[in-house]
Amino acid sequence: MTAADKHLYDTDLLDVLSQRVMVGDGAMGTQLQAADLTLDDFRGLEGCNEILNETRPDVLETIHRNYFEAGADAVETNTFGCNLSNLGDYDIADRIRDLSQKGTAIARRVADELGSPDRKRYVLGSMGPGTKLPTLGHTEYAVIRDAYTEAALGMLDGGADAILVETCQDLLQLKAAVLGSRRAMTRAGRHIPVFAHVTVETTGTMLLGSEIGAALTAVEPLGVDMIGLNCATGPAEMSEHLRHLSRHARIPVSVMPNAGLPVLGAKGAEYPLLPDELAEALAGFIAEFGLSLVGGCCGTTPAHIREVAAAVANIKRPERQVSYEPSVSSLYTAIPFAQDASVLVIGERTNANGSKGFREAMIAEDYQKCLDIAKDQTRDGAHLLDLCVDYVGRDGVADMKALASRLATSSTLPIMLDSTETAVLQAGLEHLGGRCAINSVNYEDGDGPESRFAKTMALVAEHGAAVVALTIDEEGQARTAQKKVEIAERLINDITGNWGVDESSILIDTLTFTIATGQEESRRDGIETIEAIRELKKRHPDVQTTLGLSNISFGLNPAARQVLNSVFLHECQEAGLDSAIVHASKILPMNRIPEEQRNVALDLVYDRRREDYDPLQELMRLFEGVSAASSKEDRLAELAGLPLFERLAQRIVDGERNGLDADLDEAMTQKPPLQIINEHLLAGMKTVGELFGSGQMQLPFVLQSAEVMKAAVAYLEPHMERSDDDSGKGRIVLATVKGDVHDIGKNLVDIILSNNGYEVVNIGIKQPIATILEVAEDKSADVVGMSGLLVKSTVVMKENLEEMNTRGVAEKFPVLLGGAALTRSYVENDLAEIYQGEVHYARDAFEGLKLMDTIMSAKRGEAPDENSPEAIKAREKEAERKARHQRSKRIAAQRKAAEEPVEVPERSDVAADIEVPAPPFWGSRIVKGLAVADYTGLLDERALFLGQWGLRGQRGGEGPSYEDLVETEGRPRLRYWLDRLSTDGILAHAAVVYGYFPAVSEGNDIVVLTEPKPDAPVRYRFHFPRQQRGRFLCIADFIRSRELAAERGEVDVLPFQLVTMGQPIADFANELFASNAYRDYLEVHGIGVQLTEALAEYWHRRIREELKFSGDRAMAAEDPEAKEDYFKLGYRGARFAFGYGACPDLEDRAKMMALLEPERIGVTLSEELQLHPEQSTDAFVLHHPEAKYFNV
């Protein structure tokens, strides 16, 4: 039912909801269990609560009365199990309508008895999920929809004021219940509101994996009148999901939580939340999220509802600021139509008409291959999948059922159902719980009741789908911009006015035709399409625009098509195109297209002919003879043409594994395996190192080469003779030092050295020097390598070198040191002076390889040529470095001697008397079930692609630029990993613990108080150093002093936060490393690091949103608009972490842990004060406007 039709409702319930907060009832089952019912009461159907509507109406009347008398405005009927599966288990499925009517009539009688003109009482028909999930194939959609129709008819017969579809675990089941209820109302001629409550588990998603955003996107277009949450958890676990609904739902929002998470007690599962605790939580939700209805679920009683009713009686519900985001959704996630810096890409390869591979797989019923094609499009960067099964001679309905049912659970991408047959579209809609798009409608046979337009729109309206509308009318396809816009206007007015669909749910396809025929009438087709898009977006900015893009280039060869498609897409996007049906990986960035090709393609699009110049002929000439094969196929052909041993080395360089085994078999007929490795495979790895060193190869491709090297050696190993000393070129023991859990750098060294002929003994993280030396002695190591990321680790390395001196092993073991906190100067000057043996700094894995080669050459007595240009240059560089170091030391000593004593003030010039914002609560809270899309919006792509993945690009030269790599490698791989990690549930473990604590400053200390009073006792004291020059800053200066707090009667607020991605993402990365999937390992580890940072940034923003100044002005009001400015501290205040810069004392982290208790989200603190899991980070937040990073 559309918003315009809701005046037809036979109740004033929605009016009341709009005026005040309503209170629902609590649990029914809990009360029934306390009623001492006998098996006779159930007529032998033990557990069938619905039969009590007939046998014990008195018990149910009492329960309803108790809730009403406790203050409830509405009660739910005892009809939760009046559905096909529940009653079917008792062989009474034929009584769905009857028992629904009886249960509703009981509640109606009590409501009428206790209601009055001043305060009406309402009845909500409870509609539960049943025990069978249609998305998993347990039951047919149409069967349960019709059963829900029967249940709804009974509720209408009994006098319900609304239907509450609750405890929904499957979006397809929810859709069946809502649409079944609407069908019942049409049959009965009586219309009432429908509310929907989904159940989000402790995992942060619904039972089948649906995020709250996917649920809202799927449910709201069905025409429900209110959406909310119930069951599964207590209020604490619901806050993030309610926040999403509050911000994005255009309809009222409600909640009915359990009385906490159940705990096992003497009487079985017990719910721990007391009535006053539930009331406090729900009152907070109303104030924060603007809820319209609150109540309780499992474990809640009339006592709970009495406290809730009292707590919310006088609360003024705030006006919600809704940010609506037009979207479609899969079962799992929502995809907005508006994409940042991109059109919405609709993958075209799951189309039986457009993809030969997909068609052949569908005809052969090779559904796994069909799913693989769908997943490939996900990897290539598609946002939606266009699913078309129409093919001559096939049963389209059967094919659609087979594929839609599989894609429902196998694809994280929403589906665009593409068919000319309404029966085929309906089959798809009845297997997909997410919000689909329908492709398409037009006026080819008019708009009468029997037209295909009307039949398809009936499906669109009922299922709440988005719809593609083609600019075709009874006269045919529109060719001019004027005609395209004219038909589009007619479509928009018809679809919105007669079918109740939002403009934002309409995708107008202004059609494009090939401009490659040379025919005069087609020359302007590209221009007309572009201008139609521009005019349409000008008139209707909320309407989406789309195109079947590749039509523009039909008739050209594939290479020319790719260029013309890419250029045309760019021009359409500039005109306002929102989406395109296209093969995403076949689109080139404009800067990747050679200038001549780009200009000719633009001339063709805009019909820039001259007497002596035809851009169509010129484009065809440019691509004449150009192979239609992909660049990879060309490269494989080149590879196959090389001599065998050159080919093996080149396979390593290219990272090309296909055909490797056959080449190795052939090679072993000519040379022994060890010779193949040493002479040819290692030559390939040497080339890889040179390419990396010169900036011509990126780290991900280096790791791809290492994977092929590892595979080649593994294939050759069974054919090699084992010797007692199997150390290859040399042996190194690698370890991350004691107290440090970071191992990515160490593992990259492992990969490069082990694939260049060295034996690597990698003993892991947090290794004390005793263990490192024990392994080095046991394994007869040639070299010891130590790694660490933390500043503290540099101190540990120094201590380790001193210990090696003491043990007398310095001359025996040369040492390689690496890590983010180390510098070359520190190692080669300070540490080299301490260590009695060789110690070297390795900036990266390839410098480590070069150092190993040098050390092992010297050990073998292979002295380098002292007079070679390289040796002379190295000596000059070393002499220059030492002279520079000595000069720096001399200058520093002179400056220190010349310094005059400075009087350090007690406090800096930081403003002391600033307004203190009010926190939403005191103490700490935990947050789980975070929507991935919420915090990935603050993921720093540059830090990920450049810093973590090493996509550096070329500045000039022939190689791809950084910007090219971002488009071709970075973003597609990021989308792929986010999709996979989300689908596999790895990102479901992200969690936050944060809190607000009363604080004051005392000199250089921040004191956290036991309560928000200026004279309150000290809970924890944090001491900070003060700058000895400059502004003399100290962290404590940014917190109100105790003296000023006493004078103002108000303390300051100090927020703390700790975020974690959980252990599974680290476990997954380690599995990839162990399985030699080196590139994947690098990428997953990098994503884990940057997602942790993104979550920290996101939660810092949440804290700024929650801290309120006078006039209810949030601290976040000063936030920047551009994402990049977040990474430059463009907001008010800053967050600081112990162990760095201005707060170097890592011991203070233990106090923060005591305040936050992060064990509740699975984070612990090691003896070395490191957080576990590794992908966790903590901070305290300063709200002071002058608070920015500084060093002491």
UniProtKB/Swiss-Prot annotation:
Positions annotated to bind Zn(2+): C231, C297, C298
Enzyme Commission number(s) of this protein: 2.1.1.13
Record field: catalytic activity: (6S)-5-methyl-5,6,7,8-tetrahydrofolate + L-homocysteine = (6S)-5,6,7,8-tetrahydrofolate + L-methionine
Record SMART domains: B12-binding_2
Region Disordered, residue ranges: 860-904
Comp. bias (Basic residues): 882-893
Ranges where the Hcy-binding domain occurs: 1-312
Cellular-component GO terms for this entry: cytosol; peptidoglycan-based cell wall; plasma membrane
Textual note on the cofactor: Binds 1 zinc ion per subunit.
Pathway recorded for this protein: Amino-acid biosynthesis; L-methionine biosynthesis via de novo pathway; L-methionine from L-homocysteine (MetH route): step 1/1
Residues annotated to bind S-adenosyl-L-methionine: D940, R1135, Y1189, F1190
Residue span(s) of domain Pterin-binding: 343-601
This protein's name: Methionine synthase
Domain named B12-binding: residues: 729-866
A molecular function (GO) term: cobalamin binding
Enzyme class: transferase
Source organism of the structure: Mycobacterium tuberculosis (strain ATCC 25618 / H37Rv)
Binding site for methylcob(III)alamin: G739, D740, V741, H742, D743, S787, A845
Family, similarity comment: Belongs to the vitamin-B12 dependent methionine synthase family.
One Pfam family it belongs to: B12-binding_2
NCBIfam families assigned to the protein according to its UniProt record, in alphabetical order: metH
Matches recorded under CDD domains: methionine_synthase_B12_BD (cd02069), MeTr (cd00740)
Source species taxonomy: Bacteria, Bacillati, Actinomycetota, Actinomycetes, Mycobacteriales
Keywords: Amino-acid biosynthesis, Cobalamin, Cobalt, Metal-binding, Methionine biosynthesis, Methyltransferase, Repeat, S-adenosyl-L-methionine, Transferase, Zinc
Domain B12-binding N-terminal, first and last residues per copy: 635-728
Domain AdoMet activation stretches: 893-1192
